[in-house]
């Protein structure tokens, strides 16, 4: 009898242990929301392509970095040289078209992200040209990081140094490809102005630069362990300089300090493709679960506390309003106002959330 009781107790304990992961997957409440119909007003005969990047500045202006086609291709030696496959548009806070920035810029090839820093400078990340470019608020190029392949073979440079418009390049900081991007994906800044780039599709790492764009360090490699990545795709930094990296190939968000030391990870957010973080004394994290190849019906966006607790979700995959066609970019400067850039539907939606007030709301 004692043996039987012991066996039953062991089975019960095993069942409880096996149930723990499932118990952690609590139901996520739906957040009511609306989508402003046709918010962005495009001029006649100008169209958005894949809305790879979306960002807002302190005035509420919206910037969209979009894959519009029309690229120029030059074959030279063993390399293919391409440019002008993307465009950067600006809209005012009402959605009215303002201008195109950087028309036919050498760096514009295959758009991946646009972000606006605390000084309202506009930064684009281009996966095709392997370049990160900074524009001032007037739309003039003031910095580019990395070097684009030439159309003909040339010797590798001794260093990949940033170049500021109107001034000399920064001092050499290293040699060879170690300092070169390979299909970068996103950019963020800490409180000191240090620059962080997810060097994602090719190198599976995060690179850190000082505020003058001088290389500081890199961390990460291809893999599944903490601190490794499978296509780091989006990056944001909170007011305490914690660094959040979307790691969609590993179905997680990883959190680091600003020196690259791993702190924790969130694994209950599907396939996180895009992140944004709100301003203010109480910050929130938004993450898009964007069309996991194993479940194309996924497509919702999560609202989270910075400790990983999910407050709710909204939307689903689809082509109608309030549905999402592979969200590739998020902006949430205002807590319950989210801009979502979509790939398959060629659009940006302005989303207004109506969450119930909770004890964590401030």
Spell out what each predicted region is:
Residues 23-362:
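Eukaryotic scaffold repeat domains enriched in small/polar residues
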Residues 11, 21-22:
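Cleavable N-terminal signal peptides
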Residues 1-4:
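Positively charged n-region of N-terminal signal peptides that target proteins for export
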Residues 6-16:
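Bacterial N-terminal signal peptides
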